[in-house]
Amino acid sequence: MSEVRVENLSLAYGVSWSGVLFINQTQLDLAPDNLSTLDFTIFHELGHQWWGAVVGANSNDHTYMVEGLTNATALLAQAAVQGPDAATNSLYAWMVTPYLNLLGGSGDAVADVSIFDQPASAPLSTLAYGKGALGFLAIRNQIGDTAFLSALRSYAESFRLGIAEPADLLSAFEAASGQSLQDLWSVWFDQAITTPAD
């Protein structure tokens, strides 16, 4: 695995390709005291070595399957390596706060939206990275860590070097947990009905 520090990746903090992480030095220099930004960026881009690289999904049509799942699992990795406080800080900085700002502003929007059909009032980044991750964390809360990780393992094995659809990931969570999760899945990914209480 190589890390390459680059001067400009537009507005992205990092980009991942197979075996290489590009870290945007220019963007990170804007907040040199914020090491957690660098830390979470690296956890997120490492996550793309699985979600998006080894296990594919149509990220143009179902961006949350790659970005939301990567954010959710990056939090798990960060908690394991740096402790739960670091992961909680990243959760709020990268997912909860942007999503609450959306809810308080233009209101909720559907997370499973094509990059070509995204609403102007709801940035895809907030939906895919924020609401998407929160949806996967809601599933984890519903089914527990063991079933959640078992589902991800099964999903990764089934779609290694393949392209999965949303129903494939939902099926993996349902099979691992023995629960019907369609309603919970729909609330977070297919509908625009969540509230700050969710």
Predicted segment positions?
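Amphipathic alpha-helical substructures
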Residues: 85-87, 123-198
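Alpha-helical scaffold elements that line and support the substrate/ligand-binding pocket
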Residues: 46-56, 70-74, 131-149
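Short, solvent-exposed loop/turn segments at the edges of secondary structure
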Residues: 15-18, 36, 65-68, 130-134, ...
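Secondary-structure transition/capping motifs at alpha-helix termini
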Residues: 1, 29-33, 57, 79-84, ...
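The feature captures the short pre-catalytic strand/loop hairpin that immediately precedes
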Residues: 105-125
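Juxtacatalytic substrate-recognition/specificity segment
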Residues: 1-49, 53-62, 73, 122
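Post-HExxH zinc-binding segment in Zn-dependent metallohydrolases
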Residues: 20-29, 62-107, 179, 183
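Glycine-rich, acidic and aromatic/proline-enriched surface loops and short helix-turn segments
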Residues: 10-15, 100-102, 141
